[in-house]
Amino acid sequence: MLLVVLYHVWIGKVSGGVDVFLFISAFLLSLSFMRKINEGKALNLLAYWTHVFARLLPAAAVVIVLTLAASLTILPALYWNARAVDAQASLFYYQNWNLANGAVNYFAQGISDKSPFQHFWSLSIQGQSFLLWPILFAVAAFLVHRVRFKPVPAAVTVFGTVFMTSFAFSIWETKQISAYAYFDTRTRLWEFAIGTLLAAMTLKWKPHHVRTRVVMGWVGALGLVTCGAVLPVERIYRLNELSLATWRCGPCSPARW
């Protein structure tokens, strides 16, 4: 999120920080599930959902309530209903769809057009993915325990399919309705899928070649910070995922499969 703030406030460009946010969220979530599948442990989806949203919702609810209160105090009554709708959409993790269906253009908005809840769109996509991803891991676990796949090939099959489908749809919809595509969960799932695929690969990767790890880590970190400044990331498919993969793989190198 620091990338988003720095680029929006001081540089005036899109940083790709949201892509970083989604990628890392998926990577960390997936490490836990991949270890459970690899060790033959129960996934306990309900317990996971309860734990995650019990952690996320209280802080989000406080921000939403305070933002709504400030909006009703500061803004004219003309805007109150719209802000109440935004607050509800943010609380229940569908703010991205609320903005997409409201024909909001992220890149063409004036200050007066922006909602104080707009930043919840990326958190909404994260929340939706936190609901969907455990189900997909359950499918991967089924392939492992019933179809006799190994854990990594099972994950690659499930999440590779998600990646290819989402990426292809993202290209198509961005060409058709770029403003809608920006907020569409379906055009963002491939970013989550990359994080998961990398997490799966770490089960087969071991530390090796210290200098290579250090160089890859710094190259990836530099790419993360500078992609938004050098490239028109608001118009092309971001290289942030490549930079992230390089950064995350810095501590790893391939071992025998």
Give the residues covered by each predicted segment.
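Membrane-interface helix/loop caps of multi-pass membrane proteins
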Residues: 1-257
